[in-house]
Amino acid sequence: MEFGLSWLFLVAILKGVQCEVQLVESGGGLVQPGGSLRLSCAASGFTFSSYAMSWVRQAPGKGLEWVSAISGSGGSTYYADSVKGRFTISRDNSKNTLYLQMNSLRAEDTAVYYCAK
């Protein structure tokens, strides 16, 4: 009986790991004002194409600020006024990856950027 319980517990742990949602951002760096950066967010653990995705950011000492969002198909995009015309959100559903192209960067764009489901 002990063995059986251990086996069930192990299966439960493995199932939990398999279903875990992971969002891993990359692409940040130092850039001068007026420069460009492209952020990427690799997603796993869910059906990526079924969900709208967003980018949010947190400037030093400030709260979270929504930056941009994109529909599951990629057909609709939305932007905060502060980044409109400078940032472009996109996604590649075949790669389960979300992108944020940031151009004409300003000092006030300095922040930690997060992707969100």
UniProtKB/Swiss-Prot annotation:
Cleaved signal peptide residues: 1-19
Annotated GO MF terms: antigen binding
GO CC term, one of those recorded: blood microparticle
Disulfide bond listed as a keyword: yes
CDD domains: IgV_H
Region ranges (Complementarity-determining-3): 116-117
Keyword Disulfide bond annotated: yes
Keywords annotated in UniProt: Adaptive immunity, Cell membrane, Disulfide bond, Immunity, Immunoglobulin, Immunoglobulin domain, Membrane, Secreted, Signal
Protein known as: Immunoglobulin heavy variable 3-23
Organism (species): Homo sapiens
